[in-house]
Structure formats: C-alpha cells, structure tokens
Amino acid sequence: MESQQLHQNPHCPHGSAYASVTSKEVPSNQDPLAVSASNLPEFDRDSTKVNSQEETTPGTSAVPENHHHVSPQPASVPPPQNGQYQQHGMMTPNKAMASNWAHYQQPSMMTCSHYQTSPAYYQPDPHYPLPQYIPPLSTSSPDPIDSQDQHSEVPQAKTKVRNNVLPPHPHTSEENFSTWVKFYIRFLKNSNLGDIIPNDQGEIKRQMTYEEHAYIYNTFQAFAPFHLLPTWVKQILEINYSDILTVLCKSVSKMQTNNQELKDWIALANLEYNGSTSADTFEITVSTIIQRLKENNINVSDRLACQLILKGLSGDFKYLRNQYRTKTNMKLSQLFAEIQLIYDENKIMNLNKPSQYKQHSEYKNVSRTSPNTTNTKVTTRNYHRTNSSKPRAAKAHNIATSSKFSRVNNDHINESTVSSQYLSDDNELSLGQQQKESKPTRTIDSNDELPDHLLIDSGASQTLVRSAHYLHHATPNSEINIVDAQKQDIPINAIGNLHFNFQNGTKTSIKALHTPNIAYDLLSLSELTNQNITACFTRNTLERSDGTVLAPIVKHGDFYWLSKKYLIPSHISKLTINNVNKSKSVNKYPYPLIHRMLGHANFRSIQKSLKKNAVTYLKESDIEWSNASTYQCPDCLIGKSTKHRHVKGSRLKYQESYEPFQYLHTDIFGPVHHLPKSAPSYFISFTDEKTRFQWVYPLHDRREESILNVFTSILAFIKNQFNARVLVIQMDRGSEYTNKTLHKFFTNRGITACYTTTADSRAHGVAERLNRTLLNDCRTLLHCSGLPNHLWFSAVEFSTIIRNSLVSPKNDKSARQHAGLAGLDITTILPFGQPVIVNNHNPDSKIHPRGIPGYALHPSRNSYGYIIYLPSLKKTVDTTNYVILQNNQTKLDQFDYDTLTFDDDLNRLTAHNQSFIEQNETEQSYDQNTESDHDYQSEIEINSDPLVNDFSSQSLNPLQLDKEPVQKVRAPKEVDADISEYNILPSTIRSRTPHIINKESTEMGGTIESDTTSPRHSSTFTARNQKRPGSPNDMIDLTSQDRVNYGLENIKTTRLGGTEEPYIQRNSDTNIKYRTTNSTPSIDDRSSNSDSTTPIISIETKAACDNTPSIDTDPPEYRSSDHATPNIMPDKSSKNVTADSILDDLPLPDLTHKSPTDTSDVSKDIPHIHSRQTNSSLGGMDDSNVLTTTKSKKRSLEDNETEIEVSRDTWNNKNMRSLEPPRSKKRINLIAAIKGVKSIKPVRTTLRYDEAITYNKDNKEKDRYVEAYHKEISQLLKMNTWDTNKYYDRNDIDPKKVINSMFIFNKKRDGTHKARFVARGDIQHPDTYDSDMQSNTVHHYALMTSLSIALDNDYYITQLDISSAYLYADIKEELYIRPPPHLGLNDKLLRLRKSLYGLKQSGANWYETIKSYLINCCDMQEVRGWSCVFKNSQVTICLFVDDMILFSKDLNANKKIITTLKKQYDTKIINLGEGDNEIQYDILGLEIKYQRSKYMKLGMEKSLTEKLPKLNVPLNPKGKKLRAPGQPGHYIDQDELEIDEDEYKEKVHEMQKLIGLASYVGYKFRFDLLYYINTLAQHILFPSRQVLDMTYELIQFMWDTRDKQLIWHKNKPTKPDNKLVAISDASYGNQPYYKSQIGNIFLLNGKVIGGKSTKASLTCTSTTEAEIHAVSEAIPLLNNLSHLVQELNKKPIIKGLLTDSRSTISIIKSTNEEKFRNRFFGTKAMRLRDEVSGNNLYVYYIETKKNIADVMTKPLPIKTFKLLTNKWIH
C-alpha cells in the first residue's frame, strides 16, 4: 500500500471527525459486508483532481504513517449532541461552521489531519450536510482500487480518490439496522480500524486509542440517528452512551451466515474430477473456494479438503483413494501434485501411440545400444551415458545392491556399489539430463519419494519391494544376501515375481526380492532390459524394442518413477503351516500343536527347553519353526493381556547366595467368586529362589489351620524328596502370614520369616509374577478349552507342571533340571481340555455304552494316570483308561488362526499310551484324597449333594450318550448371606455369592437404584406346581430427577426370602376389613395394614384385636376419644392447628365412616381372628416351598447353584471337542437373577454416525441428520471449542489427557433432529478431573414445588433454552480431544478450550459458570440445600442443564432476566407464558396445561401415545381396558427358568426398554405405579413368561390410562398459610426375608408433589417398628421441602405427618422409655421424638381406608386402588 499524506488546514484548528476512502469493488460472494462498486455515488473528478495537485506548504505539515493510531497526547472525548445522545459541552452551529463543516457542502477533500480532529461537533443538518468523502484515520488503505477500474481514464483523480473512504449511507429505518451495520463495519475497515472491531464473541485484536474512540463514536452518531435505532441498541447506549463496540459486537452475532458460504460448502462437498479438464483448472477452482471460505473466517484443513477431493475422483484418478486411505498427514499441495502427474501421464499416452512414433522424423535417428547381456537384446532411447556402455538411470541413494549369490540362470550378478554422493563422477549424468558440473554430496529426503510408484534404478541389479502385496509365487529366502551402500546386509524375507500389465494388454514378469528395510521400492533397469523393455527418458516412457509405448514414467525430484497401477496384486494367501508341512516339513509337528500341548508357553521358552532336552521324546528338529517367533495365539492374547510389564529387578541381591530349596517365596491368590462349595477358592504358591521350582496348593479358605497344613506339607516334601532344609520363607504382610500360629510354627523349626516392608511390593516380585503367570495361563487354558470356571485350579496345576519343565529365557536349565529331576515326558501330556472317551468298566447294564465323554485336565500327582473331567457325572477321575477323541473336520477355535487338524500328530506323540489299562485308575479330588473310580456313584464330583434314590438309574440310562450333547454346566445360585440355618433347613447353608454374567450390563451408562417388586394381575396364569414362590419386593428409591432421566440406572438388588401362607379369599360382600394377627407375642400387629391379600379389620375393630402384649401399646390415657388425635406441638400456635385443618383439602377418598379423631370402639364384639402371618402377593415364598425338597429324577441343584450356559458357539468352533450338542439351554434361578441385577445397561436411544448417516436407508431422515450435523459443526467452531490453530501429534501427548470423541444423533420430542459431538467421559482418566465437583440439576421435587407455588400465587411461567450451554464454560484442565472419526485425523489431537459434552467436569463447569452469572449479573441467590434453584425478590429460576424455568408474579421481571441472559448466552424463549388462557408447556418431559388462577394438569399423553406402540407390546389384545396395574394374590413362580441364550438376551433387553420407560413416567407424575414398576425392575434378569406378562400388563395399563393427569387446583385464597403434609404407610414383613415395605406421599397445599416407595433397610420386628421406620424416612425430606417452600414463598408454613398407626403416634408422644425392647428401637424412637418436637411437626392419625400412601407399599384390589387414587390421578 502506498504511503499517503494528509494535509492540515491552517485555518481550521478543529477539523471534522470524518475520514473516507473509496472502497474497491468487491464481489458479493466474497464478503457479506462488501459494498458493491455500483452503489458508489459519482464524485467530482475536477475538484478531486485539483485537490490531488496540492503540495505540502510550510503552513501545512505532513503526517507520518502511524499503523497503531497512538497519539502522544490523548484527550478526553466528550460526546456530541445528537438527538437523544447525552450532551457534554457540544459545539454551537457557529463553531461547527468555523470548524470547516461548510466545506462538506461540496464534494471536495478535507485538508485536516485526523490527528487534529476534534470529537466535539454539531450534528449536521440540511444547513450543514454530511460530507461525501472523508479522510481516513491512517495513511494505509486496506482496499486499494484495481488499476483497471472504470475510472482509469482520470489517473490523477483516481490516485487521489484511493486515499478516501466512502462513508456509509445514513441509517433510515430500524428494520434495516443489521444491513446498515455491514456497510458501517466495511467503512471502519477501510478506515484502517478493522483490528479494533470486535467479533461476535466480543474479541478484539488491540485496544483503540482515544482518537479512534472519538472517530467511531462521532461517525456512528452522524450516520445513525438515535430515534431510528432498534430498542436493544438504545438500551445499550442508555447504559453507556459511548459503548458503540458492544453494539457492533451484538450486531455481528445477529447477522445470518452469508449464502455464499453455504454455496461454497456445497460445491466443496460435491467436487468431481475425471481428467476431462486440466488439472490446473481443477486446482484453481478448489483453491478459490477454500480461499473464499478462509476470507469468511472459515478455515478448511488440508485433511478435510483432501477427503472431499478424493471422494469425487473417478477414472484413472480413483486409485488415489487407496493411496491416501491410511495417510493421516494429508497435504493439499501434494494431492494436487499427484493429480497433475496422472493428468500428465494420460496426456503423454494420448499423444505417444506406437503408430505415431514411427511417423515422426524426430524419432528416426534414435541411437540404439545393446547393453552388456548375452541373451537378450535391450534397446534404450535418447539418454546420456557414462563412459561405460551400460545405460544408467538416476541411482537411488538409499541402497547399493551387491549380491553374493548365484541367480537362477547361473549368471553372476555384477556387484556395484552406489556412492553416497549425488554423482560420483563428473561424467556420470542422470538419464535425460545434459552434462553439467558435478553436484555436491547430499542426503536424500524421505519426502522425495513419490507414493505408489517404483523408482527406476540403473544401479540396482535386483528389483526390491517393501510390501509382499504384489509378490507372486513367493518363497522364503534362504540363500540371497543384499548389501547397501555402506556394505551392510539387507535382510531378504522372500523371493518372487512382479507381474506387470501394461497398456495394450502387454504383460511381463520380472524377479523381485521382498524386504521392508529400504526407503524406496526399486525397479531394476537391468531386469527390464532382460525382458526387451527399455526406458526412453526423452519422451518419459517405457517401450518395447519395436517402439511400442508400454507406460509413461514420471520425473519427480531427481529420479524417474513408474506407477504401481501397472502391477498385478497377488491374491495368494500368506504361507500357512499346512503349506510348509506339505512342501518341506511333512514329518514335522506344527508349532501351534506344541504350543497348546505345552500350556501356551512362549516361543523362546519352548525352543530353549528342547535344545536343553528339558522335554523328552521330542527334538527341536521335529517341529516346524517357520513363523513361530511371530505366531500370535488368540487365546494367549486374550488370556494374558496385561497393562504393562511387571517390575523388573525386584529381587534382593542377597537372595542369590542360597542353595536350592533353602529360600522360598510364597503368596496366596484369591478368592475366586461364584464357585461351587467343593471347588477351591484360593491357591497358595511357592517358588524356590535358586531353581525356580514351583508348587501350588488349593485352598478353600484362608484360615490359620489351612495355611499351617500347607506349610507342613511342603516342608516335609522338600526335606524327603530333595534332602534340603528350608531356611527362609519370604511373604507379604497379610494376616494369614503374620498370625501367632504361623509365627510359632516358624520359630519351632528354625525358619526365618522374611516379610516385606510397608509398601514394598517390589521385594515380593517373584511370588507376584508367578501368580500373574499362572493366572494368565489359567485364563488362556479355560478360554481355549471352553471348560467351566470351576475347573480353574486344574488349569493352574497344568500350568505349574509345564512351567517347571520348560527353560525360562533367563536360565539355562528348566526348574526340573535344576532340581535334578528328569525332563518332562511329552508322551504323557495332552492339551488341556482334550476331548477323550473314558472307559466305564462297571456299567449298570451289559447293554449300556462303555464309553463316557470327558476332557483331559492334567497328569495325576498320585499315579501314572490322567485327571479327566466327566461333565455327565459332574466329577473328575484319575484314570489311564481313555482314548483321544479325533475329529478331522473341526477347527482349533473360533478365531481360526490356523486350519490344521492335529489328530495325526497327536497320535504319533501319544502312540504308546493309547491302549486301555484295566482296573488301575483312581479318582481325583481337590483335597488330594484318592479313591477308586470303579464305582462312579461314590459321588466325588465338583457339585456334590445327596442324591435322590432314582438318580443312579437316571445316570446309567441306556440313552446316556444320546442325551449327552445337551450339556448343562451348573454354577452357584445365590442365597442371602443373612439367612440363618433354621431359615433354610433342611437344605445346607451356602456362603458363596453368585455371579450372573450380563454382558450388556457393564458396557455403558449408569445404574438404577431399584428395590421393588412387581404385581401381577392375571387370573389366567397358574403358579407352577401349585405353589406361590416369592420374589423380591424392594422398591426403587429414585426421587431425584437425575436418576430417572435416562431410564434404568443404578439398579441395586437386595436379598430374597421370607415365607408366605396361602391366600385367604376376601369376602367382597362385607364392609368389615380384618387385620392379620400373629400369635407370636414378640410381634405387634396392632397397626398392621400391610397385607391386602388377607381380610383386614377396619380401624374401628382395631382395639379388639390388640390382645397381644407389646411394648408399643398405647398408654391408657390415650385410649379414650379425648386423646385420639394427639397434638405433638406444645407451642401456642398449636391451638389453631387441628386434625381437620391438616386433612382439609387433601385428595383423600370420600368415606362415610366416622372422622379420624373418633376412636370409639365399635368392634369390640367382633371375635379375634387368629391367622398365620402372610406376605404380600409379590413377596416371599410358600411355606411348602421351604419345607419340601425337590424330588426329581434329575439331580437337584444345590442351594448355591444354578445352571449356566455352555454356548453353542463354543461347541461348534472348538477343534478338539468330542461331541456337538444341539442348541443348549440357559437355566436361570430367580434368586440368583435378582441378586445379579448389579447394573443394567440403559437402553440406547441415540444413533451413531454410521447408523444415522452412513448406512441410513431413510433418505429423508438422513438428510435431516446431515443438516443437524453441519449445524453442530458450525456451532462448535463458533464457540471456539478447541484450538484450531494447531494440531498436536498423538505420540507427544500423555495418553491420560487424551479423550475419545464421537457424534451421536437423536430425534427430540418436538420432532427435530439433533446431532451432538460428545466426549467419551465414560473412559476418562480420573486424574483429568476433580471428582469433588458435581454436575447439579434441579431436583424433581423442587420443580414440582415451584409449579405448585406458581399455581397458588398466579405466577407467570416462562420456559427458556440456552443453546450449547456447556460450551460457554471454559475448561481448566489440559485435555486433548480426538477429532471426529470421519475427519481421518487418527494421529492428531486438538487442545480443548471449552467444556465439551460428555466430559466428567463439563456439567460442574457449566453449573459454576451459570451460577456465577445468575448471582453476579442477575442478582439471584441459590436456595440453600436445593441446587439449581435460584431466586430474588421477584423471580424464581429452576435450572436443568440448559433448560430454565422462570416463575414470577410480574412478567416484566422475567423479561428483564431474559434480556440479561441474552447478553452472554444464546437464549431461546420456548414459551414466554403470557396470557390468561390455558398455556401448554413441555417441561423436562412433563406435558403441562396451566391456566393462571385456576388449575394445572401434568401428564405425558402425547409422549406415551408416540412411544408405547414402538415397544412391540401387543396393546389392547382383547379390546378392554385394565382398571388396575395389578392385584394381590398372584405370585412370581420361583422355578428355574430354562431358556436359550439368544432368547434370554433378547428378553432381558426387552425388559430394559419396558421398565426403563415405565420408571421414567412413574417418577415424573405417576406415583401410583411406583410399587409395580420397581417390583418388575427387580426381575429384569429373570425374564420368565410370567414376568413378561406382568410387564406387558403394566405397559397395557399405562396405555389405557395414558390420558390420565396429575390434577392440581388453586388453593383457596382464604388460606393464609402454606400446608406441607407427608402421608406415611408401611407393610410389615411382606418383603423377602421379612423385610417391610415403606412408602410416603408428599402434598403441598393439597397437591401431590412427590412419592417414594422403598424397602426398609433393616428387618423390623413389629408393625409399629415398620411404621416408625416409614415415618423416620419421611421427616428429613419433609423438613427440606419446608425450607424450600419458605424460601420461595414467605407465607407461614404448617407441617403435618399422617399415619394410620396409633402405636407410632403413642410412642412419639409418650415420655415413657421403659418399654423399648432393645437399644436400636429405643434410639430410633427417641430420635423421632426429637425430630417431631424440634421441627414444629404435627402428627395425626388417618384411617387406613383413606391412606393414599397404601398404593406405595402393596398391590391393592381394583376397587381400593381406584378409591385411593381417583382424587389426584384422573
């Protein structure tokens, strides 16, 4: 930009504030703020010309260029008078006239310097018009005019006009303000103020000076009259009259994206190129688009641009896709170069055809020279030679080929070494170059390589390739040696041929060597000449001797290259062991077989062991070792996967001085859970320091006696077998080693006990590493064999035998050899899990089969036999009477890592052990007792229980082998650990816990805390075996909104137990309800209302039933009617609070009985009913079920067993299996299934990128998701989510700081499609966030309370949404995000700047950000104890992530908050809430209908109508509606569920969907369904037909009642106080193990705002104790709600608690402490007294018939259910 000068007018000390330069013509598609040249008014060329001829005079001073606009003496800037702008010493019109305003009446140039411009001026009017051109602030203009402009005929004028800025047109209307701002910003940019204009985020590049501030302020006022400004601009200026930059910032953010940007994105996404146009044209087109986007502040990365270009390539350019597919560092320039090369190649081929070459005279005199070959004539064209006659291309500097072998044709390959210099001789030239001076030595850069091309090398005698992809007929190399330029050997992996398919169908083949140790793929020119192919470097082609062009060659850098597209890929599979066996090693054993036989030991250990003869009957030469070092065993990879290597060098140095067996290392591993009682849960290992000999012993427990027995055994073994004495034993500091018993044992025997020091795990490395090794082997062996987990110790023992027999990499001998023992006899070893057939020499019948299928485990310790597992008999035997089962068509395993069959090899190894030996096998058990296996009914098995009488006949059935394929593997069932022995007699007590594996439950998502049971309402379902088994009845306690927003979360199960009596039919004709009583004196049934399945005595008859002495009996003084409703409060205010005032306006059922305050005994004549205690319809088990044992022909399961699946896939895919059973069944036990509900995976409602876009067949939906995707990308870039200026290399960043990312898509409730870019916070490292920070959202009770108060006080309710809320919160930690997968930046990372969705800390960061803004900028305060509830004197705000609900009496107060929020956040008004008619909201999933001063209705009809039919549940199959979700008297069958694996997973997934949706609805507003929902949630892992029917029935009831709403009416205006009431109820002992169900319902001013149903945490011993527990659970939440109500509404509050237990009220009121039966009960009651008296709580009695909390504790009959709910749910 030319330097320009501004002249000062000596007659004008105060010049104008205006400056202007004419803007250049800018295309409209380049800048949304550009001003078209056609819109510029004409200027007076003559006056401009005159002004341009002025010279600097002594009276004027030239102002030097100042790019920073810094004035040495900045002056204050008082604003001028302009309409409504504030006045601060304005100039008068006369002064303005003197200030040269009159000069602006003519289109002449102002002569004053901008540094002398005064900010004080008078607003121009018709007498003082605006100037047409204004001198700029700087002498540099950002927009020079093109010299070829339309005004070029007046060069002088044009030159001068270039120094002027065209002022923006005056602002004329409020609606066009955004358009005018574009011109005004362009005006400021042309005035050299672009770097101080804020962007839409309010960021500026530098601070402005006072003069610049005055310049902007004055020009804005001059062209934008105050009365024409929009309201929001006026509001800003009213606060700060000079804050023009804020106005510009907000204006920029409001501008819509330019249409040209969208067009450029579409053009870039739809690029296509096939070579029809020149490559240069295509490059210019793409570069222009990218440049335009860059001008609009949209940076397109090279990676993204390359991907879009590659997508549109076709024809010969298409192969570039594969070339760039695996590249991460894409460069756009490199891709354009590749396209240009291909375009040039095609162009050359079109010009150079064989018929044309012979016609041109320029090719006729081409010299032909034959190279130094005897067999083949080779012709080359037009290249320069060295002094030798052999033609040479440019040499590759990375290799000098030198051969030391004979070629196939016995021709010796000439040795030649290429110098490291570019040209070693002055006369040596590259082909196709003129002779020049020799070049200096240089190093080849790896960037010189041309990808997917072969370097044509004249110095290489052999062709070398780095990839075997193109190598045909490859054979392993054993003879050829190649050296590089430094005479270093280059290893050659294989020898083969390269097949070329040139143009015109010419095919040829040359020999090539495969090595990955070269920089380029080298194509030997001499190899080409042997095939009559020559290189013409004049025309850059490969030709035949007759001149036919075969292919073009490319000059790139200093070399010539041939494209690999002419190579034919090799489709021959890699060399396999089969191929090697057939061709070279017919009699050798394949390495995978030996690897399996030797316990999956590593390659080095096996090879070294064979060299040292540690394994007999097998030599190293007997095994095929090719590729053994690189062989990957999938079972080893899975079973031995580790995080990192164990600490090396942890052994102390002095330990090496001991002799063999003097220094032992020991450690205990365990426990292994979920095993049968007979299987060991621990093992203790010993390792000798010197020999590294290893022992393992099984343990069932870690008691002192068990450990002592093992130490006694091993010390005796070492003393007798090795004649050695143990001196030192090193152990850790576990209690099993540091106890007095073991210490005394060591002291008596003179053994030093060496313990590790505190936190010194390194000193115990030998034992720790042994345990890790044994467990790795154990997992691998079990996985490979598919055997059940209870055989885990057999795998450990097998591994110990193998490890003692192999040489470790650090030793020269095996442990057995060090110990002086013979090597392992390989003929005695079978692969772990090898299928065998065991001879049954004592069958039950002579016609029964003599063979029993089994699986070999390990050699016996106590005999010469083998330990074999017999699944059909559930036992292991020690026998030699077995034969190996062969199957020549099976695979080794499901990974198919080789396709060999090892039967023949195995037969050769074990040939002399294949015959049966009679009467010599013994049975093996884990306690090492040996017995005979002659009698298979001796019951030495893994899962042993006394068998019924007819078991033997069943086990020896003639069809035993036919039924054998249906394999059942029993795993433990779980029972409650708290059950005492008398509770489960006559079965034995089990202490082990089960483990029900649910793969889906551990993958993602949270957990749901669930403790409920489920009702069943079906008269058609009959209990199996005429009994009513129980089910767990623990209720879900999910009052927090956080727990229910995403369906099922945090399901915690509890134990099942209890007994249940048969159902007593209720007489529906009588109006008298009977309560159950118990003859046991210790149980008080005075207020028992827990069992709706039995007749219940009404409250009037209650006194007559209380004939059982109890500690909870009311004192005599409270048995009269005078004390029926005791008032707990002693203060003066209590005299105005009565039971009627508490019960008034509550939605209780209308009954004709006496008031609850009347306790007159009207039922004293009714006889007392004696009945046994029964459980509710869905809890406990029949007494008959407890007292009887199963008498089945099949062996009964133990109490801690359940049958688990043997996968069919495991049977089908194992190579060494005996039989393939039909489809196996999975047996599920009810108790184990319920207790296995640890964490249920929530149903995924979102879609991945491939599901939503890539493979989405719904084009309309796909388009919507694509649109949402682009919108999300734009938002992320707009919010500066990550640092776009730099990409970080993945290898340079700490992996802990790297967060994975992904796109998720979903459809919102309003039908819009949403895309969200999220971080994988579920795998975020704990060190990258502060675990103390919590992401808070408004509690659902707080929202319901706020809505209730809003109804009673006629509040306006406004709903807001903040877009991309989390992205407004900065992130403090240093974190890096993986870019989205579709960008292809696999090795690059982005530095996060904002709190991306999904991060652990994002929610907490956003909460702190919005909380700070609401407090500091909106004058709000957070309510103590209730997060995300904010209030001030006028407005209450409930915050749920990015949703805000505003409550206020004055709608303008809400609007004021909205205005403040919009200054900082992109705030959308979902529903302003104005008007007096009914307004509908969708607030956090609730569909709310609200009419101020009248009512509020909460429901989910629209959502349920849409979602329920999609659950694939048959709705209304019989066309009639259900009247209740369930009824009492129905029981969940406890019989084990036998189901296919796939069907089981499918049903569990279905249960998750159904219960997840039901749970969401229940905790929103359908509190009447909570008991039923949570009951079924406990049975998700037990999806029997009965459970599914009950679930379908619940969904059906929800469908039939989907239009039901929670109805609230405005409180009566005569009520001056707020009334908060909790209604409590408990069902005594109706839950498993006699636990009680408790429930509470909370009401504010007669409106139900919440409900809770859960199981009592402790077992209650009476109904009163259960009721006390229920009341104690309600009081804390009641107090918290009371505090919230008082904060939100300053009215006085009355707190009441209603219960139908008089004894509970008596205990709360009484001061007598002598009757408390135990300390716990007493402290509970005393605390309850303190809470009631200290919190001004009124406790009153309510009739059971009116107790609406009854629906929270038990299933009710239809009539009772409707009676208790129809007042508040209808």
Swiss-Prot record:
Low complexity biased stretches:
369-381
- Record GO terms (molecular function): aspartic-type endopeptidase activity; ATP binding; DNA binding; DNA-directed DNA polymerase activity; RNA binding; RNA-directed DNA polymerase activity; RNA-DNA hybrid ribonuclease activity; zinc ion binding
Q: Which residues bind Mg(2+) 2?
A: D1361, D1442, D1443
For the keyword Protease, the answer is yes
Where are the annotated segments for Integrase-type zinc finger-like?
579-636
The biased composition feature labelled Basic and acidic residues covers 1151-1165
Q: What is this protein called?
A: Transposon Ty2-OR2 Gag-Pol polyprotein
State how it assembles.
Answer: The capsid protein forms a homotrimer, from which the VLPs are assembled. The protease is a homodimer, whose active site consists of two apposed aspartic acid residues.
Q: Which domain of life is it from?
A: Eukaryota
Active-site residues, Swiss-Prot/TrEMBL: D457 (for protease activity)
Residues in RNase H Ty1/copia-type domain copies: 1625-1767
Could you tell me which residues belong to the region Disordered?
Answer: 1-88, 359-449, 1005-1038, 1057-1135, 1146-1165, 1170-1205
Give the reactions, separated by semicolons, that this protein catalyses. Answer: DNA(n) + a 2'-deoxyribonucleoside 5'-triphosphate = DNA(n+1) + diphosphate; Endonucleolytic cleavage to 5'-phosphomonoester
Query: Record's Pfam families?
Result: Pol_BBD, rve, RVT_2, TYA
Record-marked site positions (Cleavage): H397, N398, N578, N579, A1232, A1233
Which biological process annotations from GO are given for this protein?
DNA integration; DNA recombination; proteolysis; transposition; viral translational frameshifting
Annotated Reverse transcriptase Ty1/copia-type domain residues: 1353-1491
